[in-house]
């Protein structure tokens, strides 16, 4: 293991001792804010320190076994050879575990997201494919016990969506979906195609973490234009009688968000403001993320919206993710919500990139 990583582990061990003492301090116990903060840090550090202690014990066992290799008794030497082999394997596994635990955590991984799907090139076929993608993510959300709430939708003339925006709420939503941003391409024969020719169309997907109150960008009300209109979305006859839908334009950036799915104008405004904050946050962080990805020549994790990330080929039943050269012949299962088959290899590749950079 690299010396820089061992230094980090020594620092964490010292910090763990400090935290143990602090959590037993009467002054800290009486201050609930400090006590909760230290408790959270303790919970994060404790498993790493415990595993590091195990690593040090196994290193000691290895040194003892290696000393026995010089023993005059051939039986002892034979036993020591086997013990050295097993202990070295243990060390490899423990080091790999510790490296994964030391990877920098994305503070957004546990957040809910705003999922934006827009039809691109391909006209009606692109809109139909937007609908396919939205159903795919909705089914995936069902499998994971997440809740999907449509905020805004613009349906296509022959099905699907020209644009659909949803909020996805649940456990580690952003951590799972963050690499879905980009251009998704579909190749298939449209139902209206009499010659059986394959058409290519595309949609763009954007996954934005929902900011919390501390993370939310401060927005000057003077920079906003707020319009109300009658919703064409869910809610039945009630929404047709009131201007409950909200459209907010952020004048300095030109970003427009709208929410029409709630009956309450107040709720629609709150959702729209949260989405606007997410888009402004994304605007700030995307440039930095792209610069880092470019510098390290990363494909996974760049989040470039214009990057073609995946192709769905219906005649071949094939899904190809171009970032990790992954090809699966299980298109129906993926579209039915089995997106983990694509997501997990992407997360593994990203983790490998992080491990390569760790300790540099």
From Swiss-Prot:
<dbReference type="InterPro" id="IPR005139">
    <property type="entry name" value="PCRF"/>
</dbReference>
<dbReference type="Pfam" id="PF03462">
    <property type="entry name" value="PCRF"/>
</dbReference>
<comment type="similarity">
    <text>Belongs to the prokaryotic/mitochondrial release factor family.</text>
</comment>
<dbReference type="InterPro" id="IPR050057">
    <property type="entry name" value="Prokaryotic/Mito_RF"/>
</dbReference>
<dbReference type="GO" id="GO:0005737">
    <property type="term" value="C:cytoplasm"/>
</dbReference>
<comment type="function">
    <text>Peptide chain release factor 1 directs the termination of translation in response to the peptide chain termination codons UAG and UAA.</text>
</comment>
<dbReference type="InterPro" id="IPR045853">
    <property type="entry name" value="Pep_chain_release_fac_I_sf"/>
</dbReference>
<dbReference type="InterPro" id="IPR004373">
    <property type="entry name" value="RF-1"/>
</dbReference>
<keyword id="KW-0963">Cytoplasm</keyword>
<keyword id="KW-0648">Protein biosynthesis</keyword>
<keyword id="KW-0488">Methylation</keyword>
<dbReference type="GO" id="GO:0016149">
    <property type="term" value="F:translation release factor activity, codon specific"/>
</dbReference>
<feature type="modified residue" description="N5-methylglutamine">
    <location>
        <position position="237"/>
    </location>
</feature>
<dbReference type="InterPro" id="IPR000352">
    <property type="entry name" value="Pep_chain_release_fac_I"/>
</dbReference>
<protein>
    <recommendedName>
        <fullName>Peptide chain release factor 1</fullName>
    </recommendedName>
</protein>
<dbReference type="Pfam" id="PF00472">
    <property type="entry name" value="RF-1"/>
</dbReference>
């Amino acid at each position: 293991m690299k010396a820089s990583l061992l230094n980090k582990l020594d620092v964490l061990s010292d910090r763990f001792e400090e935290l143990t003492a602090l959590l037993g301090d009467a002054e800290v116990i009486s201050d609930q804010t400090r006590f909760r903060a230290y408790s959270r840090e303790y919970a994060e550090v404790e498993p790493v320190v415990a595993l590091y202690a195990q690593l040090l014990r196994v290193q000691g066992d290895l040194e003892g076994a290696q000393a026995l290799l010089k023993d005059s008794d051939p039986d002892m030497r034979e036993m020591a050879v086997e013990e050295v082999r097993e202990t070295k394997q243990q060390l490899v596994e423990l080091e790999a575990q510790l490296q994964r635990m030391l990877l920098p955590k994305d503070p957004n991984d546990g957040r809910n997201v705003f999922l934006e799907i827009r039809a691109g090139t391909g006209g009606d076929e692109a809109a139909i494919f937007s609908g396919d993608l939205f159903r795919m993510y909705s089914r995936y959300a069902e499998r994971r016990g997440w809740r999907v709430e449509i905020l805004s939708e613009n349906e296509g003339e022959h099905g699907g969506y020209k644009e659909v925006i949803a909020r996805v709420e649940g456990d580690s939503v952003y951590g799972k979906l963050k690499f879905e941003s980009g251009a998704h391409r579909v190749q298939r024969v449209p139902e209206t195609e009499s010659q059986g020719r394959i058409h290519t169309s595309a949609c763009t997907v954007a996954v934005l973490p929902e900011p919390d109150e501390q993370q939310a960008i401060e927005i000057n009300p003077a920079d906003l234009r707020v319009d109300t209109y009658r919703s064409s979305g869910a809610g039945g006859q009630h929404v047709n009688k009131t201007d409950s839908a909200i459209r907010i334009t952020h004048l300095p950036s030109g970003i427009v968000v709208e929410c029409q799915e709630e009956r309450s104008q107040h709720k629609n405004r709150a959702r729209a403001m949260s989405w606007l904050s997410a888009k402004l946050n994304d605007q700030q962080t995307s440039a930095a993320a792209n610069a880092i990805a470019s510098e390290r020549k990363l494909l996974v994790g760049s989040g470039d919206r214009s990057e073609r990330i995946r192709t769905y080929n219906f005649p071949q039943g094939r899904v190809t993710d171009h970032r990790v050269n992954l090809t699966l012949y299980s298109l129906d299962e993926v579209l039915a919500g089995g997106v983990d088959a694509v997501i997990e290899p992407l997360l593994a590749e990203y983790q490998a990139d992080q491990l390569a950079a760790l300790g540099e």
